[in-house]
């Protein structure tokens, strides 16, 4: 299982310290590789094919050394996807604990997801598949599993409404959950399409007005 990155560890620009990297543990080296990869995906060349030569140069090690930390580039991207899942779903779990009202839960979770996308453009490119266009097809399937899991999370939250609040929805909970995930995917795609000039949390409250009637 890949080591987990926190959002804070993704944000700062990594420093190139090739002279010191050999003193770091394997876990720290893997962390650095993933952090540098994330920032390269964030950069202006983030849509270009990511090569191990380019990544090794930015990390400050040889390609051979890079493969000591990860057996393949595919494994690096798989680790990034696992870290996205860990970061988002841990925050979803926290939101569920802090908020008991279903309407507020869904609102807060959507807002949190869009905030994540805003802060992590490189990872958003992974979620839309743009960063994976030149990689193995199984990575696209792995991202699809992430969205399936997100949809199931929404289904569970919506189904709990009847037990917690004694209320139901005018349409099936799974249909609503599918719409919520599609809404997220659409915002991610627009963010990438506009090269992150349009932030998904801008105008969110106005867009929320189309979702809110489902909870009445």
UniProtKB/Swiss-Prot annotation:
GO terms for biological process: cell division; negative regulation of division septum assembly. Residues 13-23 have a biased composition (Basic and acidic residues). Keywords: Cell cycle, Cell division, Cytoplasm, DNA-binding. The keyword Cell division applies. One of its GO terms (cellular component) is bacterial nucleoid. Residues 1-23 are annotated as: Disordered. Residues 51-70 bind DNA. Belongs to the nucleoid occlusion factor SlmA family. Homodimer. Interacts with FtsZ. Required for nucleoid occlusion (NO) phenomenon, which prevents Z-ring formation and cell division over the nucleoid. Acts as a DNA-associated cell division inhibitor that binds simultaneously chromosomal DNA and FtsZ, and disrupts the assembly of FtsZ polymers. SlmA-DNA-binding sequences (SBS) are dispersed on non-Ter regions of the chromosome, preventing FtsZ polymerization at these regions. This is Nucleoid occlusion factor SlmA. It comes from Mannheimia succiniciproducens (strain KCTC 0769BP / MBEL55E).
